[in-house]
């Protein structure tokens, strides 16, 4: 389910495109142009946007919508007739474009506020395993995974009836173990076991990932996947640190017109948790120079230690504005105050 902050930024982005005279008018009633926004969602949105906790988020997102309305590479001053909100709906399949709003059936919008996450994926899908893997830690580092589990099981003691082997954990075991570990720091023994697990998972995962993209064309396609460059162009409206983010994400066709892929490297990092770093080198023909884009993948438990099988979270470490294939639709503006902060008061009236 989408968080309240996510709903606020996505709906405010759409509102900014509709050409209202002021924000107070914009939130006075549910616009007829909005599709798939329920009365319950709208009422909550209209009630909280003027609270101090959410004013900065609302104002920044609303401004992004206003800029998109006037941008030459956006709506060119024509308020849309239709804004479809995706909300919590999930598209079937893997790695769909990260779209939150669809405007007039044509303009695809991704609202990304203070997030460096590019993609959440099943490790077996991202790292191209030959088979579906239930628990990536068991696949990449079975001995280290079992050693960590044994240490945790011994510390938890008789409070929970747990099976001797980590591979035998059922859903109810995982739930109980998650609760038992929620307020507990790793002991020195468990911390050492976790470091060994992290190092081995990073090493094995990076090695398997490299083998799965043996050719230059495969590595180029993987880079496009990591950067969420797909068959249709879309816009990213959001924020990065203290600046607005207004970008057009191009397609592979557009990308190859300007850029030439050189290489993509992957390696396991000694970071205290399972991490695989990645770095792509690209030739920018327009600028007549080589450029790099960096990121990393965290292979970590979903929703708490041992709660679920690990997932792969792909992060972008290079600023969005410096990524090959991400084009500016305007000059970025500074944000006043911290995101979701209470220091800056931006009343709607």
Residues covered by each model-derived region:
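Short, positively charged
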Residues: 1-99, 103-349
